[in-house]
Amino acid sequence: MEALVYTFLLXSTLGIIFFAIFFREPPKVPDRGGK
């Protein structure tokens, strides 16, 4: 059970940090620009 809790907390933290950085810095790749 401890492993599950630690994994969940780690994923949540990484997700929050990723979204924070993503929203702070707008993506340079256009959404509908293809490659």
From Swiss-Prot:
Pfam families: PsbT. This is Photosystem II reaction center protein T. The chain crosses the membrane at residues 3-23. It comes from Cunninghamia lanceolata (China fir). Found at the monomer-monomer interface of the photosystem II (PS II) dimer, plays a role in assembly and dimerization of PSII. PSII is a light-driven water plastoquinone oxidoreductase, using light energy to abstract electrons from H(2)O, generating a proton gradient subsequently used for ATP formation. One of its GO terms (cellular component) is chloroplast thylakoid membrane. Its main location: plastid. Belongs to the PsbT family. PSII is composed of 1 copy each of membrane proteins PsbA, PsbB, PsbC, PsbD, PsbE, PsbF, PsbH, PsbI, PsbJ, PsbK, PsbL, PsbM, PsbT, PsbY, PsbZ, Psb30/Ycf12, at least 3 peripheral proteins of the oxygen-evolving complex and a large number of cofactors. It forms dimeric complexes. Keywords: Chloroplast, Membrane, Photosynthesis, Photosystem II, Plastid, Thylakoid, Transmembrane, Transmembrane helix. It is a single-pass membrane protein. InterPro entries: PSII_PsbT, PSII_PsbT_sf.
